[in-house]
Amino acid sequence: MARIAGINVPDNKHAVIALTAIYGVGRTRSQQILAATGIAEDTKIGSLSEDKLDALRDAVSKFAVEGDLRREVSMNIKRLMDLGCFRGLRHRRSLPLRGQRTKTNARTRKGPRKPIKK
């Protein structure tokens, strides 16, 4: 298994799919990285030389991925909550942010139903 950005990338998959195992790298960004490094999308990661793997590591390191990206997202949410804006309040109350109805739906976000006390 090749290690890129601290993640074990599967050797037996095509490069375009294998790179999506890294948090923050989807299909489009994976295609961009492979085009920049000159690696064909249907090449298996296990068959790449060490030089090509180093080029992939350098290309991936130019983007915010894994821990840095997770930290950035959580800091953005924390900032919204500290500001007290509408989205921050919805995060704080664990409710949907984007205008969905909550009278009957939103069970995933709100959690299981709470019984009515008599």
Curated annotation (Swiss-Prot):
Organism, as annotated: Idiomarina loihiensis (strain ATCC BAA-735 / DSM 15497 / L2-TR)
Keywords: Ribonucleoprotein, Ribosomal protein, RNA-binding, rRNA-binding, tRNA-binding
GO CC annotations, alphabetized: cytosol; small ribosomal subunit
Chain segments carrying region Disordered: 94-118
Molecular functions per Gene Ontology: rRNA binding; structural constituent of ribosome; tRNA binding
One Pfam family named in its UniProt record: Ribosomal_S13
Keyword Hydrolase among record annotations: no
Protein name: Small ribosomal subunit protein uS13
Residues forming coiled coils: none
InterPro entries named among the record's database cross-references: Rbsml_uS13_C (IPR027437), Ribosomal_uS13 (IPR001892), Ribosomal_uS13-like_H2TH (IPR010979), Ribosomal_uS13_bac-type (IPR019980), Ribosomal_uS13_CS (IPR018269)
One GO biological process term: translation
Function comment: Located at the top of the head of the 30S subunit, it contacts several helices of the 16S rRNA. In the 70S ribosome it contacts the 23S rRNA (bridge B1a) and protein L5 of the 50S subunit (bridge B1b), connecting the 2 subunits; these bridges are implicated in subunit movement. Contacts the tRNAs in the A and P-sites.
Cysteine-cysteine disulfides: none
Record's subunit section: Part of the 30S ribosomal subunit. Forms a loose heterodimer with protein S19. Forms two bridges to the 50S subunit in the 70S ribosome.
Keyword RNA-binding: yes
Family the UniProt entry places it in: Belongs to the universal ribosomal protein uS13 family.
